[in-house]
Structures are given as structure tokens and as C-alpha cells.
Amino acid sequence: TQAFLADDIVPFDGAHQAGIDTPGQAHLNIIAFTLRAGTTIDDVRRLMTVWTEDARQLTRGHNPIGSLEPELATIPANLTITCGFGPRFFDIIGKTDQRPEWLKPIPVFSKDKLEDAWGEADLALQICCDDPLTLAFATRHMTRAGGKMLETRWMQQGFLNARGATDPGTTPRNLFGQKDGTVNPQSTAEYDDYVWI
């Protein structure tokens, strides 16, 4: 018999990137990258083409080109792969006029003790899934697919309750026991006002 959640797919293609208004999956990796010196806009186009097609295949439970472990690509389990750009990205590709006005360094608050090692990056991937093995495989594959253009700056892992452990739509608790995400956008109108650009 088929395992619960194994074949569940979040469509990769749509009006917006999957993984933003998607119900939270149980496991998360956020990987931040810097573009290596000498990377050109043509290099970035190639990277985005490769990442887009590989993410599309992985989220469908298919093996992407260049995969080293095809047997690990078969359980999509709500896998989403979402890409974001940092402020410096637009400088590097020579498109500063396309950088959103609000995309700037995060302000420092008086109590912050921020470390540069965990700071902003040129690109980030948010990879979420209900299966930790699929998540690990997708993370490794997408990082490897970045090739010589990228240097991994940092990675953070996160988690929520397993699917079915709480009622759908329940606001999760963080490790301090506090409800986390209570005021996140919920409705289409809120997403239109605060999220989509």
C-alpha cells in the first residue's frame, strides 16, 4: 500500500511560486548563497533555467537531469522549492532598476547581536517537504546544481508538527511554547496587499 502523503504534490507552476502561501510542511531547509566573483548575467540565466527545471521535476517526484541518486526523487510529499533574491543580486546582474524599493539590508535593532556569517545573501532557496529524506535529497541536488557559480553561505533547518498531528490551520507553537505566525496573511486579499509584488 502507498504511504500516507508520499504522492502528495504541490504544483510547481502557477501564478506565484509555490511554498509561499502553501500550508506549512513538516520540514524546512533555507540555504543562502553568494554569487562567485566573475558571475555574469548569462551565468545567472543558466542557473535559473537549471534550477527551475530541476525544481519542477523534483516537486513532481521525478528524477532531474544530473541526479546522482534517482531512487531518492520518487516521494514528493508536498515538496516545494522557492527562490528569493537579495539586494546585491541586482547589482551583480546589472539590473539595479529592477530591484524593488523595499529590498534593502535588514535594519539592526538596539538589542541585536547580528553576525555577518549569518547575514544577507545574493540568492536563497527555501525547500520544504513532509518527508525529511526527500528534503535532504532536494537540498543536496539543488546546491550541487548551482555548480561553480555559487558559494553556500549558510543553511538553517526548521520544522513544524507532522501532518496530521494537529488540526489543519492550527497556528503552530515555537520552541518557547508561543503561538508563532498568528498574524500571518490568510486571505487572498491579505496576500494581494502584503505578499505578492
State where each predicted segment sits.
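Long, histidine/aromatic-enriched segments associated with O2/redox biology
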Residues: 2-197
